């Protein structure tokens, strides 16, 4: 079967830049779906997306749909005809369903069968519907109409190219009649561009100053920006999302270096970077020490004969933005940061839990409680907690919400607060996402933990638990943040005490009974997914969870020890033994004695196991005290041989009650040694 390249390009007014790549990918996916449904084969595919066009190239597409045969079985012959040989309703209904007379139905087999040969259609007849369906299915939240047309699309359409080989696919879609004429760059080549063949699409447009390939434009911008930054003895800040957005804004990218007055560098650089990136789509430059340079890179959509005009225009546009940031910074510094707390008395945190001012006071007290437990300073943590929300009421954060925490840091330093107190105002929000930076100071860690625990306890306390995908207060992220800080910073905090302290602070605002346990369970449940992501089996997590450690660091140390233990040759057998022992002990009548009485031993293997347990107990006690859990389990692995010998030679449920009870006590001692680390009976 012969095959040819197929190209479809829909020209539009400027498409939403943040949605450009997703629209292109969805367009391709829709066309592929239609081709597959039609049984049309092809060898390759490519999507192109630029500000004024979406295009798909399908390589070596079948020009003819293959013929198809369909066979539909109906009712059995016995049910299709009565004793007189007349057709029943079942037979007549089947024929009607197939759209034919009963005489056209095959009656030679055990069932009625309808067979039909369907000749394939020409691909040119199928493509218009496939393309139209794909465009209709694009993820467009809000469609628009234009002029007198009743058609709807994300932006008004301007032209349509549809070629199969060198032939135009005759159709009209979204008010545009298909042809082979595209459009070039709006200024460099406003004339139409004739697309000779689908394979020449990219090069035909390149001659018209349009780079249709999104990836090519992105790479060009990235490479040229890096080169220009190097020429300025700096490094460009190029967030992937911003690079994608800029790529979606230009058809013929030309990066240019611009500058601004050095006086603006007195403003926190985070504010300057935020406004230049978010509002102007500029790439900022940093020096070798990470300080902002008074220069930036803009990406023009034109190769100007006088690029200085473009540079001056961008410098003129950015100046008012930077002036605003400068004004807010100076205004906020006219009063101490702490005074902004008064404004927070009128800002509601949550209707049932009070104001942001109330939250800051709770965070202050909880941070002061947590700090000494992790090696920090209670007074400085309390101070940082008190100031933690002040910058939310400042002009700077009002204009640039992304500056919360960062603005507080600069204002605290301006007021002469200690460095760690100032840093904590920003570190309280860490980690800001999965894998993001953690607090570097103990004061910051204490405030971050306190802030997150306060939110968890408060929201749980009024019954607003996260459900499914709904988590408006980001409680899952808060819990994971607490765990990451404690585990990755190696901070040994008993969360039980901290959560109970947080509960008491809310008083009658929350339903206290069982609240602490509920919050702790939620927090430690987050570890399950964390360990699964690290490739740690869920059974390992459950073996430690059964002991309910209150410290996240201690929990993690136990998990790592169990994971190492499972690699030992003795692990599987000892896990099975622990499970057997657990089952035996659960059936014991009455309390199990704490002391083992050797006088009731009547088998040498009992003495051997008892001696091995005694020696192991003495060896692992100092290990347990030092939380050397891996070493402890490695030592306990040596119990395998005496344990195996015991169960081979000894009947635990002896007839003599005292002997039986003594054996239960011996096994309880054995199990207790392992429970010092984890319940390894759950590993089986």
Swiss-Prot record:
Its main location: cytoplasm. GO terms for biological process: arginyl-tRNA aminoacylation; glycyl-tRNA aminoacylation. The keyword Cytoplasm applies. Signal peptide: none annotated. InterPro entries: DALR_anticod-bd, Gly-tRNA-synth_bsu, Gly-tRNA-synth_heterodimer. The keyword Ribosomal protein does not apply. GO terms for cellular component: cytosol. Its EC number is 6.1.1.14. It is found in: Cytoplasm. Keywords: Aminoacyl-tRNA synthetase, ATP-binding, Cytoplasm, Ligase, Nucleotide-binding, Protein biosynthesis. PROSITE patterns: AA_TRNA_LIGASE_II_GLYAB (PS50861). It comes from the Bacteria. It catalyses: tRNA(Gly) + glycine + ATP = glycyl-tRNA(Gly) + AMP + diphosphate. GO terms for molecular function: arginine-tRNA ligase activity; ATP binding; glycine-tRNA ligase activity. SUPFAM superfamilies: HD-domain/PDEase-like. PANTHER family: GLYCINE--TRNA LIGASE, CHLOROPLASTIC_MITOCHONDRIAL 2, GLYCYL-TRNA SYNTHETASE. Tetramer of two alpha and two beta subunits. Belongs to the class-II aminoacyl-tRNA synthetase family. NCBIfam families: glyS. This is Glycine--tRNA ligase beta subunit. The gene is glyS.
